[in-house]
Amino acid sequence: MKKVLALIVAATMGLSSVAFAADAVAPAAAAPAATTTAAPAAAATKAPAKATHHKKAHKKAPAQKAQAAKKHHKATKKAPAQKAQAAKKHHKATKAAPAQKAQAAKKHHKATKPAAAQKAQAAKKHHKATKKAAPAAK
């Protein structure tokens, strides 16, 4: 069990798993070979080698193919959005025109109350001063 752990530690540290397995398994294989036949010894030598061998996952190639396929798709949704945006630019603003007409109508109303006040002011100026003439008569 300690040798298996040593193999795992060695594999994670980046040492050559083949060279380390040959050194670690040779004494372990010699002990069972002395008591048993050569077949279990061969099985003992193959087991650690399979445990340290790591196969690479070959899933990147299909993902890369799908990524390349994504790049070459045409963007069909952007074209209608652009057409709608151009249509928005050419619409006439119908609500703004009546508001402008109402504003122009406000400017042309006659101010009737200031005219009445001016008329009253003119009437004040033309009153005769009767009190001033009386002291001059004395």
Curated annotation (Swiss-Prot):
Keyword line: Periplasm, Signal
Modification after translation, per record: Proteolytic processing gives rise to the active protein.
Keyword Protease: no
InterPro entries given in the database record: Acid_shock
Residues making up the propeptide: 22-85
Positions of region (Disordered): 31-138
Segments of skewed composition (Low complexity): 31-50
Biased amino acid composition, Basic residues: 51-77, 122-131
Subcellular compartments: Periplasm
Signal peptide stretch: 1-21
Pfam families: Asr (PF06392)
GO cellular component: periplasmic space
Function noted in UniProt: Required for growth and/or survival at acidic conditions.
Family, per entry: Belongs to the Asr family.
Name used for this protein in its record: Acid shock protein
Species this chain originates from: Serratia proteamaculans (strain 568)
Organism taxonomic ancestry: Bacteria, Pseudomonadati, Pseudomonadota, Gammaproteobacteria, Enterobacterales
Gene behind this protein: asr
